[in-house]
Design a protein with these regions (language model features):
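Generic hydrophobic, amphipathic alpha-helix propensity
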Residues: 3-14, 31, 56-60, 64, ...
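Hydrophobic/aromatic residues within well-ordered alpha-helical segments
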Residues: 49, 56, 60-64, 123-127, ...
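Hydrophobic alpha-helical connector segments
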Residues: 55, 69-97, 148-151
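Short amphipathic alpha-helix in the helical subdomain of ABC transporter nucleotide-binding domains
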Residues: 3, 10, 144-151
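Amphipathic alpha-helical segments used for helix-helix packing
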Residues: 94-115
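Amphipathic C-terminal alpha-helical segment
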Residues: 91, 111, 152-170, 181-185
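Amphipathic alpha-helical packing segments from all-alpha helical-bundle domains
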Residues: 113-139, 149, 180
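Helix-turn-helix
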Residues: 9, 13, 17-51, 55
Length: 185
């Protein structure tokens, strides 16, 4: 494998392990073994688990920006928010079993007070800001930001509850309720 392919394999593998085991419980050896590469290949590509995590976070950020850009092709802000919620609805089984990869990393990294905690915070803040922007456009008032707060809180709580209970059906039902709430505005 060339260096680019090894890097992609490491990032994909680390992403999956961080999601399922958590960042703190994942060791470099876990990544190496699951990626089916040598420790030397890992060390020639990344200097540490932290650097791998930075790349995972940069990937999340890039993907989220691309999703927002795609949603913004739709002129209807209610539809944009519904499309965003569809992503969670479609991933309900995985969320109920393993949680949300971004929120899981947030819980692991938020108290570290380092670049990783800043990066994960920026990703969630970007999502929150996008929600706020959609509600401001939809309701034509700056005071609509509290609706963005409400949506962010609801999603966060639902992800936590789904992982706690393992109940994908409950999660889906609540996502449907959130979509109905948005449509009613």
């Amino acid at each position: 494998m060339n260096k680019r392919a090894i890097s992609a394999t490491i990032i994909d593998t680390a992403n999956e392990l961080f999601h399922k085991k958590g960042y703190l419980a994942t060791e470099v050896d876990d990544i190496v073994n699951a990626a089916n590469i040598s420790i030397q290949e890992f060390e020639e590509t990344y200097s540490s688990k932290e650097n791998v995590c930075k790349q995972v976070l940069k990937s999340y950020s890039k993907d989220l920006k691309a999703e927002f850009k795609k949603y913004e092709e739709n002129d209807n802000t209610r539809q944009r928010l519904s499309l965003f919620l569809d992503k969670y609805f479609e991933d309900a089984e995985n969320i109920a079993q393993n949680g949300c990869p971004v929120f899981n990393l947030y819980y692991d990294l938020c108290n570290m007070n380092n670049e990783l905690s800043e990066l994960i915070g920026e990703i969630l803040e970007m999502q929150h800001k996008w929600f706020d922007e959609q509600f401001i456009i939809m309701l034509k008032t700056e005071s609509a930001v509290d609706q963005g707060d409400r949506l962010m809180s609801a999603i966060s709580g639902l992800i936590l509850l789904a992982k706690l209970t393992g109940d994908a059906q409950m999660f889906k039902s609540q996502i449907i309720q959130l979509r109905s709430w948005i449509r009613s505005m």
